Amino acid sequence: MRAISPRMIRGEFRGRLGGFALDASFSVPATGITGLFGPSGCGKSTVLRCLAGLQHLPGSLCDVDGDVWQDDSTFLKPHQRPIGYVFQEASLFQHLSVKANLVYGAPRGDAGGAAGVIAFDEVIELLGLARLLDRAPRNLSGGERQRVAIGRALLSQPKLLLMDEPLSALDRLTKDEILPFLERLHARLSLPVIYVSHDITEIERLADHLILMRAGHVIGVGPLSDLQSDPALPLATARDAAVNFAAIAEAYDANYGLLTLRVDGGRLLVPSGPVEPGARRRIRIAAGDVSLAREAPRATSILNALSARIVSTSPVGPNEMLVVLGLGPNGNGARLLARVTRRSWDQLQLAEGIEVFAQVKGVALASERGVSEATK
């Protein structure tokens, strides 16, 4: 068997499925949420089925946290793999109550608070299911059914949770209701999750790492922010390009309702309610909300102007330049994207390697309660 370093999930899946050729290799941390993203039909769900053992491609490899589920001499069947699987449509037992659905398939016996065990009461709290326990599935909304399906998967005590576009069958309002619950799961549980979606807003809200696919191939693997800011990949050149990264709350100004966030390479002021110092927050800054200046701006309504250095540039269409910025005077901090016109580029005499000020006109602050837009 081929051993790899622990705390990683490694997949090498190759083969033909009818007219579709899959050649997908990746290695991601066995912690947090890894997004599996790409256009419809690129092979995302097929990779998930390979991880689950529902699809057998001979000669492939599947290693989860040091346990080999598939290699040249091994193939564990789906029931032998400690996985939880959440599908696009919640498949609940209609003749059972919500509570009975939740405990169906859970390991028998009392775990007694054993390390790593996900407790029933914890799942009920995290997913907001207490008032639903005695209901029948037919009396639940689409979002409630999906929350029950997620809870049932968690209570099976999986080593890996697979989620195949779990929000795709829901309308936007229902998606917005469920996303905060998924964020809470992410914050409270150490269980690794592979999350399939073709909706970039879900990936930006939830994922720590990303597997980017196109036409059956993996074209990028790594931390979400790294792939978002790589001009060689499609996320950076998209019209709605943005970068997500972690921030730490430092102070709150109750007089102005402004939260000071420390990021790698600078500080940001964001309109917000009170937040405890040290709390971690996730922020999103769109390329279209970043403008550049050669000197520190004065007398402006824009709250945030960060020292940065131009790391790289590339043309986007005939009129614009995509600029990758590194925060901090040396450019060693977090990466940002900016889109500037070619005219502005020439007039400001911008070039790779020079120091600039990145004026951030808008910051999306994600929290357990959702996303609030902070502008100017």
Swiss-Prot record:
<dbReference type="GO" id="GO:0005886">
    <property type="term" value="C:plasma membrane"/>
</dbReference>
<keyword id="KW-0500">Molybdenum</keyword>
<dbReference type="GO" id="GO:0005524">
    <property type="term" value="F:ATP binding"/>
</dbReference>
<keyword id="KW-1278">Translocase</keyword>
<dbReference type="GO" id="GO:0015412">
    <property type="term" value="F:ABC-type molybdate transporter activity"/>
</dbReference>
<keyword id="KW-0547">Nucleotide-binding</keyword>
<comment type="subunit">
    <text>The complex is composed of two ATP-binding proteins (ModC), two transmembrane proteins (ModB) and a solute-binding protein (ModA).</text>
</comment>
<keyword id="KW-1003">Cell membrane</keyword>
<dbReference type="InterPro" id="IPR017871">
    <property type="entry name" value="ABC_transporter-like_CS"/>
</dbReference>
<dbReference type="InterPro" id="IPR050334">
    <property type="entry name" value="Molybdenum_import_ModC"/>
</dbReference>
<feature type="binding site">
    <location>
        <begin position="38"/>
        <end position="45"/>
    </location>
    <ligand>
        <name>ATP</name>
    </ligand>
</feature>
<protein>
    <recommendedName>
        <fullName>Molybdenum import ATP-binding protein ModC</fullName>
        <ecNumber>7.3.2.5</ecNumber>
    </recommendedName>
</protein>
<dbReference type="InterPro" id="IPR005116">
    <property type="entry name" value="Transp-assoc_OB_typ1"/>
</dbReference>
<keyword id="KW-0472">Membrane</keyword>
<comment type="similarity">
    <text>Belongs to the ABC transporter superfamily. Molybdate importer (TC 3.A.1.8) family.</text>
</comment>
<keyword id="KW-0997">Cell inner membrane</keyword>
<dbReference type="Pfam" id="PF03459">
    <property type="entry name" value="TOBE"/>
</dbReference>
<comment type="function">
    <text>Part of the ABC transporter complex ModABC involved in molybdenum import. Responsible for energy coupling to the transport system.</text>
</comment>
<dbReference type="InterPro" id="IPR003593">
    <property type="entry name" value="AAA+_ATPase"/>
</dbReference>
<dbReference type="InterPro" id="IPR004606">
    <property type="entry name" value="Mop_domain"/>
</dbReference>
<feature type="domain" description="ABC transporter">
    <location>
        <begin position="1"/>
        <end position="240"/>
    </location>
</feature>
<dbReference type="Pfam" id="PF00005">
    <property type="entry name" value="ABC_tran"/>
</dbReference>
<keyword id="KW-0067">ATP-binding</keyword>
<dbReference type="InterPro" id="IPR011868">
    <property type="entry name" value="ModC_ABC_ATP-bd"/>
</dbReference>
<dbReference type="GO" id="GO:0016887">
    <property type="term" value="F:ATP hydrolysis activity"/>
</dbReference>
<dbReference type="InterPro" id="IPR027417">
    <property type="entry name" value="P-loop_NTPase"/>
</dbReference>
<dbReference type="InterPro" id="IPR003439">
    <property type="entry name" value="ABC_transporter-like_ATP-bd"/>
</dbReference>
<keyword id="KW-0813">Transport</keyword>
<dbReference type="InterPro" id="IPR008995">
    <property type="entry name" value="Mo/tungstate-bd_C_term_dom"/>
</dbReference>
<feature type="domain" description="Mop">
    <location>
        <begin position="299"/>
        <end position="369"/>
    </location>
</feature>
